[in-house]
């Protein structure tokens, strides 16, 4: 506890990590380019530089607050200093702003306007670098990189992947994979978190918008869409809807307007995953074999496991992800001439996740050699399509998702938040022993945004020990302990993105603490408002098992990672 003088006003501080946080607490939005509260302090951009009473300047992001400090944030000297920094950054920056995919959301562009930088006095003498579009998930354009280091620290600090780093020195410095390899040839897991923190257009989503428009225009095609749970609590943010509000009904109406023939709910696929994964888990748990069971619905986590811990691949659930279960079932359904009207099917997923773009290409995501899902659009891409079509979001009437795949349980909806898969499985496995008490489950430790959570749940007199992890650096930390025998779990849920899919790499940007919490609570509220709480109580799922899935459960809902690896290596 202490106080400091900021621009002539006394401001008290308690546990703020740096002077920058105290300044913002005082209501002053000091500019930054390289500072993120969840990443390590870098202090490279120097935009947050302030001046003390003796005229000494320092970066406020890397200075601890001290009682009695006197600082100034907006002196003529600092204003000039910040403008020069932006000028120098722009001088070595590709300035095709009007056609840049990040235009309107570019932090560098915003700061140039805010600080009054209208001319750049310096010539750009940098040699252009080739664009790296080798990944199915992201595109890297080094010509738009300002060397802020945010992507490097995200990939290292939070994800523990280290697929990119700084290379070369001085004016030749760039951010690059090792040995300038294409990003697709590295350990990159396609999580897209680098894109989330990139302040410019240097890292962007690899878009499928144009091919989806083409499919919608084809009269000989049935185009169907599935909407993931996390999308419904984020898509409205760009249209003035309160953060975290569930806009599923609006999205269904909008997708119908865009030309999609049928719009379904991925929560239905999540219910199928719960049914199969809970069965698989109980078989292993009762036999005491191949434990822990790791969830496998996050493709970025699956790839991380394959790259770093191949010995744990046999412990991955054989269940397909909700997206892929849904895709296989829907494609089987539309094989029936009564359902396809003689037209070909194009299956599109609306996802919060860039890694889903890679998942649909994996060998184990195909049925009889054919992709079950044709294209993945992220939440951000869907927002772009809505804007291009000129649809006024607030004026679209709410519509229900189409049957037979448009009904999902509350358990399926909470898949989009960390701990949701574990909670959904626990709701299911207590059936026949002790009916799941929702309040008891909520307070068991499955909820909350801690990176690593541990719960012990009583199942018919036996203890189920489970871990819930979000963020791959946290997963790495936990896996090392499991591998060494230091700890043991029966069930481990892993999501690559911190807090789960609500914070996926394909979600809208500018997600501060309030946004993160609002999205998580939005899914929990959607669960509360859903009449069906458990996956096994979904009547549409029950009828599927009695009909289309008879004799085809393993073929359509499961995968073999070992066989898929052989196929990839052919």
Regions found by a protein language model. Give the residues of each.
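Short structural boundary motif marking the start of a folded domain
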Residues: 1-4
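Iron-sulfur-associated redox domains of electron-transfer enzymes in respiratory
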Residues: 16-68, 74-78, 206-570
């Amino acid at each position: 506890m202490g106080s400091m003088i900021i621009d002539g006003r006394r401001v008290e501080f308690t546990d703020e990590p740096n002077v920058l946080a105290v300044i913002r607490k005082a209501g002053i939005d000091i500019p930054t380019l390289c500072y993120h509260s969840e990443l390590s302090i870098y202090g490279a951009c120097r935009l947050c530089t302030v001046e003390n009473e003796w005229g000494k300047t320092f970066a406020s992001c890397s200075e601890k607050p001290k009682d009695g400090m006197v600082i100034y944030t907006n002196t003529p000297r600092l204003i000039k200093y910040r403008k020069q920094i932006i000028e120098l950054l722009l001088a070595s920056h590709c300035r095709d702003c009007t056609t840049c995919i990040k235009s309107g959301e570019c932090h560098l562009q915003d700061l140039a306007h805010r600080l009054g930088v209208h001319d750049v006095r310096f010539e750009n003498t940098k040699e252009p670098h080739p664009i790296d579009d080798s990944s199915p998930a992201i595109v890297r354009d080094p010509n738009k990189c300002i060397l802020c280091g945010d992507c490097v620290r995200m990939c290292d600090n939070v994800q523990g992947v280290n697929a990119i780093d700084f290379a070369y020195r001085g004016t030749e410095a760039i951010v690059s994979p090792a040995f300038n390899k294409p990003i697709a040839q590295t350990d990159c897991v396609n999580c897209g978190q680098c894109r989330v923190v990139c302040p410019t257009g240097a890292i962007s989503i690899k878009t499928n918008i144009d091919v989806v428009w083409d499919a919608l225009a084809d009269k000989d095609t049935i185009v169907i869409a599935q909407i993931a749970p996390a999308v419904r609590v984020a898509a409205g943010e760009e249209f003035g809807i309160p953060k975290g509000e569930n806009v599923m009904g609006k999205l269904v109406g909008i997708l119908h307007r865009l030309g999609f023939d049928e719009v379904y709910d991925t929560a239905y696929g999540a219910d199928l995953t719960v049914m199969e994964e809970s069965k698989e888990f109980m078989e292993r748990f009762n036999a005491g074999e191949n434990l822990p069971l790791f969830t496998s619905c996050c493709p970025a986590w699956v790839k991380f496991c394959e790259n770093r811990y191949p010995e744990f691949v046999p412990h991955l659930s054989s269940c397909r992800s909700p997206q892929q279960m849904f895709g296989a079932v829907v494609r089987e359904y539309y094989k029936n001439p009564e359902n396809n009207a003689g037209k070909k099917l194009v299956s599109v997923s609306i996802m919060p996740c860039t890694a889903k773009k890679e998942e649909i290409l994996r060998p184990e995501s195909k049925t009889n050699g054919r992709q079950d899902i044709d294209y993945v659009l992220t939440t951000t891409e869907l927002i772009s399509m809505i804007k291009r079509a000129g649809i006024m979001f607030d004026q679209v009437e709410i519509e229900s998702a189409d049957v037979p795949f448009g009904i999902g349980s509350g358990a399926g909806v909470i898949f989009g938040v960390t701990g949701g898969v574990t909670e959904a499985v626990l709701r299911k496995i207590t059936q026949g022993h002790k009916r799941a008490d929702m309040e008891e489950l909520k307070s068991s430790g499955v909820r909350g945004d801690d990176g690593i959570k541990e719960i012990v749940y009583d199942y018919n007199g036996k203890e189920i020990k489970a871990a819930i992890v979000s963020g791959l650096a946290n997963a790495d930390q936990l896996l090392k302990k499991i591998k060494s025998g230091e700890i043991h779990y029966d069930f481990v849920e892993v999501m690559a993105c911190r807090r789960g899919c609500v914070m996926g790499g394909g979600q809208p940007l500018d997600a501060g603490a309030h946004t993160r919490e609002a999205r998580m609570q939005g899914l929990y509220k959607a669960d509360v408002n859903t009449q069906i709480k458990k996956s096994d109580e979904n009547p549409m799922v029950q009828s599927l098992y009695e009909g289309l899935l008879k004799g085809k459960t393993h073929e359509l809902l499961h995968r073999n990672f070992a066989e898929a690896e052989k196929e990839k290596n052919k």
